[in-house]
Amino acid sequence: MPTASMTPNPFLSGSPEHAAAAGPLAAFAALPTGMQLAFAIVLGLVVGSFINVVVHRLPIMMKRAWLAEIAEATGAPCADDGLPARYNLCVPRSACPHCGHALRAWENVPVLSYIALRGRCRHCRTPIGARYPLIELASGALAAGALALFGPSGAALAAFGLCAALLAMSAIDMQTGFLPDSLTLPLLWAGLCVNLWGTFASLRAAVIGAIAGYLFLWCILWLFKLLRGIEGIGYGDLKLLAALGAWLGWEALPQVVLIAAVAGAAVGLVATWRGRMRFEEPLPFGPFLAAGGAATLFFGTPFYLLLGG
């Protein structure tokens, strides 16, 4: 919950009464509720389309950087991956990963282009993964949820930013098994900055949350290593929980961890029972931490009480 502050909180100034301070947010707040909701959904869909770019390209960019470092250290030539030399989140244009067909503007419209193309590349007819429209729809729903919960305010934008980052990291973790520092660490600092004004937690609770989130899973990691001789959790998960602590405060961490643990155990057991994975096979924990963080952001303590807290 936002805490009182002696200085104006720019993240909570979206109501018409704060027109002078809010600027564009005040104008947005004056729009009919239906228009606000429609705008939020469209914004969420567009951001979801960009999240798909991040999920696809960021692991490739990181692999390139690792290989370049290895080549520099060993003097060996870097293997050619067949991609342009200039490859980042902005260039080159989006293209089919199978045939290289550069997508036109209408082929990049979130969700609608997937429906129009019937889930296949227009050029080579290779199926397009369902991940793309699902992430776009999830992003649109999260944007609408943030607006409904926090109203037309900076807090809603910040909440959606958190959810968008969690969505991107979850997809990357499920795809690759790791959480990039280039996402977890900026998310941690962003949480501390947002809570300078006590937007979601006091600054004190946010700092303690960042420290406690990291140390808690660090202890679990080393306890597991002492008992089993292996690391049962990745360091990216430590940084993600630290980031959630920075956003939501230390008081939210038990609920986040409980939701993540219960959801992870349930999914793992069902997947093992159905033969989708072996019992000893590692299951990415990042998506469950992200789900716990999003659930805590949107539902707060009552959600924890429903679980028996």
Swiss-Prot record:
Matches recorded under InterPro entries: Peptidase_A24A_bac (IPR014032), Prepilin_IV_endopep_pep (IPR000045), Prepilin_pept_A24_N (IPR010627), Prepilin_peptidase/N-MTase (IPR050882)
GO terms for cellular component: plasma membrane
Presence of the UniProt keyword S-adenosyl-L-methionine in the record: yes
Recorded GO MF terms: aspartic-type endopeptidase activity; metal ion binding; methyltransferase activity
Alphabetic keyword roster: Cell inner membrane, Cell membrane, Hydrolase, Membrane, Metal-binding, Methyltransferase, Multifunctional enzyme, Protease, S-adenosyl-L-methionine, Transferase, Transmembrane, Transmembrane helix, Zinc
Enzyme nomenclature, EC number: 3.4.23.43, 2.1.1.-
Record-level GO BP terms: methylation; signal peptide processing
Keyword 4Fe-4S among record annotations: no
Cofactor binding note of this UniProt entry: Zinc is required for the N-terminal methylation of the mature pilin, but not for signal peptide cleavage.
Pfam family, one: A24_N_bact
Entry binding sites for Zn(2+): 96, 99, 121, 124
Cofactor: Zn(2+)
Catalytic activity: Typically cleaves a -Gly-|-Phe- bond to release an N-terminal, basic peptide of 5-8 residues from type IV prepilin, and then N-methylates the new N-terminal amino group, the methyl donor being S-adenosyl-L-methionine
Transmembrane segments annotated in the record for this chain: 35-55, 147-167, 183-203, 207-227, 230-250, 253-273, 288-308
Entry membrane topology: Multi-pass membrane protein
Subcellular location: Cell inner membrane
Job of this protein: Plays an essential role in type IV pili and type II pseudopili formation by proteolytically removing the leader sequence from substrate proteins and subsequently monomethylating the alpha-amino group of the newly exposed N-terminal phenylalanine.
Family recorded in the similarity comment: Belongs to the peptidase A24 family.
Protein name as it appears in the record: Prepilin leader peptidase/N-methyltransferase
Gene (UniProt): gspO
